[in-house]
Amino acid sequence: MDTIPQLLTYAATSYGDSKIYSPDETFTYKDLELEARRVAKGLARLGVGPGDRVGFWLPNIRAYLGLLGACGHLGAIAVAMNTRFRKAEIEDVIRRVEPKVIAFVSSIGRTNNIDVIKEVEPALLSKCTALIQCDKKNVIHIPNAECMTYDTLVRSEPINYSLGEPHSPFCIFNTSGTTSLPKFVLHNQQQVTRHSTEVMDLLKMKAPEAMVLQSLPFCGVFGFIFLLSAVSAGVPFVMPKIFEAKECAQHLINYKVTHVAGG
């Protein structure tokens, strides 16, 4: 498997009924594969195509997975935005990466993300085609930016093609360095899928009765690869929105978790 669409198709056809548990719902790999193709259609209608950037300012939720798959289909680039980002960091991402759309939730923990977005320089937000709200709250109104819900994308007809190639740029992560601003690192689809398979094999994720706890944020490299390694194995996993020690400890017991990562 050398592309994200191939990875999702394999998981859906070989382990389609394997479950993904989130705080709000339970869904399957088969559901995810279809949702990714629906979201891809919705993003394509917004003008997202090969090489375009999609900002992910999200905790570990279902929409993160659907949007990742959609970017894979379109040959677009998923830009990981740390959930701790505030006005300065978000403005920096928009200036340097120029995402066509940004996906977000109205709050993460005790932080009101809508207030943060409203502080962003309007001229910068106007460079985004749309802001995609990925929770069930009322859609926000931001001057100079079109706002819509993730559910709007999910209601699209699924695409029946894929523009993603092995060497298509796929994801951007930021890393700390010697300068005040983060550095950006770009990975293609083949690099990501092959590494996830290597991690899957190393950790023996295909072992009988395997159950994974996604305790690390997907906006970081470790959490991101741990997620895709689970998908590569077609293994069921538990996906809390953010790490809370007591909650995750309970998940370890309730779901009989065999694989968990920390950092």
Segment roles from a protein language model:
Residues 6-27, 134-141:
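AMP-dependent adenylate-forming
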Residues 28-30, 170-194:
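Conserved AMP-binding A3 loop
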Residues 52-53, 59-79, 83-87, 96-101, ...:
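A short helix-loop-beta submotif of the ANL/AMP-binding
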Residues 73-148:
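Structural core segment of the AMP-binding/adenylate-forming
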Residues 104-118, 216, 243-244, 257-263:
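Adenylate-forming
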